[in-house]
Amino acid sequence: WGEEKFRAALQERLNKPLVPAGVDLRSNEKSEHIGIYRQKQPLMNYVGLKVPVGRIHADKLQGIARLAEKYGNGEVRFSHSNSLIIPNIPDQKLGDLLEESLVKEFTYHPSSILRGLVSCVGIDYCHLATIETKARALQVASELEDKLPDTAPITMHWSGCPAGCGNHLVADIGLLGKKIKRGKEIVDAVDIYMGGRTGIDPKLAVKVMEDVPCDQLANVLEFVVPYHTREKMYPIKGKKYTRKWKQSSPGSAQKQVKLIENPILETKASHEELL
């Protein structure tokens, strides 16, 4: 029949018009609104500041409000990517704003890892969470910045429980918190998901590793991230590779990461054959 004939027949049966949903405004263009951007208004700008994992103390938030009053129109906005936005900054005030200490602390040009870092509130304030997320997310990000200073932009989202408030299923790397037994002790751990994205062609992330202890996570991600920057995410879509983390001797992260390395390379080769 085709879409138009089906729509006409359905409207006839329902005896009422079917209003179109409108224009799809989704796009694959990614913007966390972190940085310096021109506004539509002439000679006006907005500055997006990264607040690492969304945690900011009251005195510093008040300081941001004072900056908004001094350099803008007193307005501060918040984004889903854990950032603060100060809009309506005239050109002549922009340079002075960028020299403020708070702007240097909550920078508008974070590293490629910190830029895409998002975390749910974690066990500190949520009774559903199984692990602490915010401090761990910062710690892992800091270690990865040292290990991978030149990595391409990547999103890394932490969720402390299956409720998924950190949106781990739509990130390049999603981390889902859990507890595991290691020897005789119970420790914080994560399942690792990869390949999620939003936009015009959304995809849910694929779980590729299970039960990775948080205290060894940075060592694992050091070897995983290079395969999963945005340019290399798509080969693993649609396939599920689940591997249990196997504890072994210290310093063996390179051997352990091979649990997932071969499946990734295998699907990468298959993907390239289709091009």
Residue ranges and their predicted role:
Residues 1-275:
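Peripheral terminal and linker regions in Fe-S/redox and tRNA-modifying enzymes
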